Structure formats: C-alpha cells, structure tokens
Amino acid sequence: YTTYMTGQMLKTNFSLNDKYTLFEGRVILSGIQALVRLLLDQHRADLIKGINTGTLVSGYRGSPVGTLDINLVKNKKLLDEHNVKFIPGVNEDLGATLIYGSQMAGMVSNVKYDGVLGMWYGKAPGVDRSGDIFRHANFLGVGKNGGVLAVAGDDPSCKSSTLPSQSEPALFDAMMPIFYPGNVQEILDLGRYAYEMSRYSGLWSGFKIVTDIADGFGSAFVDPQRVNITIPDFTYNGKPWKHTQNAKLVGHHSLP
C-alpha cells in the first residue's frame, strides 16, 4: 500500500527485513548489513544470468567487522535460500584457507553449483597474518563462475584498536585489486564490481571497510538492473583473455 504526501509516494507496509528482501526501491541499513545484502544481491544477479552459484563465508571477528558473524547467523534462513553458507574461522588464517579451498570446487566432479563465490573477513592484523594464504590463492586463481572478496576491516582512528591500520599495502602485495567503498550504497555497488573483477581476473578482490562505514547507517537504492557491468574486450598473446586455474604450485610451475 502507498499513500501520497507532498507529491511523494510513501511505503506503508514497511518491514525491517526490507533491507535484505526488497528487490527495488530504497532501503536503510548499516555497513555490516550491506555486506550481508551484497551476498544476496550477487546470487540474485547470477541467477538472472542463468548461473546458479553458492557462496561460502568465513573469517574471524574483529572490529570494525566484528559483528558480521552475528548478522550472518541471525539471517541463516534467508542465507540458506540464497545458497550462502557461513562457517566461522578459528582464526583468520583458517578462514582464509577455507575460502581458498572453496575455489577448487570446479576441479572435482559432481559439483552442486555452477560456481562458488567466497567472502573472507578479518581485521587488519588478520590481513597481515593471512598473507601467505592470499598469495597462494591468487596463484591458484578463483574457480569458474567463482570469485572472492577479502573484506579487510580497518580502524584508522583506533576506535577499538591498539594501533591504526591501513590494509592497502598488504592487499596490494598479495596481488589483489582493491575497492574502498565510502558509504553503504558503494558497498552494494562496488561489491558487485569487486566480484566481477575477481571472476574476470582470477584474483581475490580486496574490499576495505573502515570503522565509520561499518558502524554507520545510511540509505541505498536497490534494483536488480542498477549495476550493469561491461566485461572488457581484452586480448592476451593474441587471444581473448580468459582466466584459467593452475593448481601446480610447486617448483618451476610457480616461476615466470
């Protein structure tokens, strides 16, 4: 139902769950809630393209992404409906290794989904300690119709940290393209670009979230057609670029 006030249409059947379930319109949500919504939106976008994907989320709590796990658990039923599985990590390294393994799903037979997406999350110190997994994951490459976001929680003002943090150098060193959303709208929009960048390049996409964005609330416009991504017409060695995986991470196979 709608009513008209000062020439504007007012939605009267509002639900707190609209921030996750509304397909088209305006929603209000926090930065952490936007990360949850991003998982759902990416799955919906893949279904529109005829791709049935599953998603694995793992990592370790730590501000400013410390409440992501709570929000994932609270919305388990909704996540299950969108093929999203959450397995918290004992630490950041094990969470990253779990996501690393998810990208090998296409290497085995009888797979359940057309592709597996991943989302790793951790505070800046977790980015530091998980660098070895990040590098190995990027040498392997993401799976077909897959893609991974490495959500790095930075606390530059030390709101709840002993030291200020800036994760870009570590993410760059791990060969990741980096996205840095400045509000909840950009989490939803740039998140879609980040997944497509990962899928196209074969690399994990770094996704930097600072305290003010994670803890803050804002409004965002949602629409299945809002983000229209054009895949580059890029050739490599005279052939159209297509990412392929390489699991031979030993000896001369890892050298140029």
Per-segment meaning from a language model:
Residues 4-38, 42-45, 181-256:
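Flexible, low-complexity linker and terminal segments
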Residues 63-199, 210:
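Thiamine diphosphate
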